């Protein structure tokens, strides 16, 4: 679990997301409260439940980006899912219980990667010993714990030095590698993912891994042997137990597009299904027990963050019980022309820096003047005003159209420097941005 303070979390989010201070603060406090709860003693700790968050705002203002960046900062089991993927039990489609199953799978994968990183130094040492055994088969008795004979020790150390310096990387050796059986893929019918997963696991357990001798270059052999030794060092039962506990205590679920499962004033059969999804979500958000192949998972302390544009619906269109499960509501603001300018220049991976890096691979130096950046921001903002407001995503469309000629003829322009100024921006985009019809279909 991340030990970052709310200020540190907001500072990290500021590197990638412009504005939306209220949303960043709410998410930062919620993430910090996960850590605070762990410091509280029992039985009070069990009574402290997370305060779920509902983020409301138009498309393209940073709701999903906050979730993506939060996933990297959280250092906890995290899953982002679209609410529209799920249907009421009895309808064709995925049921909401699969959210928790997917979260557990994510936690298992995360825990395995963490263990592999932790065991890598020891795994590399073991892989090195196996390569030396293959190079000097008589220098060692069988088994890792056996000591090399005194007379061959000097030779072994010489080979070890050459191996570490990369002098033997292209030499071929015969090594035994554990070959896992090819996994049998079973396509799950809607609503039967858990049963299919159990059947697939049964078939995998039936096929035992076999050892196979292969002739490989030392460079390739080292990589394969390190992976094999790292996997051997993992205690699978302990890993699964810790991952399940981590999900129950620190898991975070990001429910995107929750406004798409709201019911509107006019009732239709699809609205009934949407209400069913909301009712199915209720016990999950409130706290229930879900059966998975790794055991029973309690959802009482899993944090749920929901988001939606709420263009055609209002948060009050959610069923009252579900509204009550998201006590913290945050409204995200529409982006201004100044916000667009900051998005173009002030984030760590801003669009201008991305396009400069892409075209540099073709030998093209791309420079943007200050007035060009301001003009791009103005055009993106005005097109959003006169057509559909798609937020920061409009900048991608504008930048692609602006640099279309340079990107297409990159080989011809190789070795040159291009300065993008306001005049060039107007030449490429001026007419398009001024005509509502052209802007609607081109930008």
From Swiss-Prot:
ATP binds at residues 18, 60-65, 256, 321, 393. The keyword Transmembrane does not apply. The keyword Transmembrane does not apply. Pfam families: AAA, AAA_2, ClpB_D2-small. Residues 139-161 are annotated as: Disordered. Its main location: cytoplasm. ATPase subunit of a proteasome-like degradation complex; this subunit has chaperone activity. The binding of ATP and its subsequent hydrolysis by HslU are essential for unfolding of protein substrates subsequently hydrolyzed by HslV. HslU recognizes the N-terminal part of its protein substrates and unfolds these before they are guided to HslV for hydrolysis. HAMAP family: HslU. This is ATP-dependent protease ATPase subunit HslU.
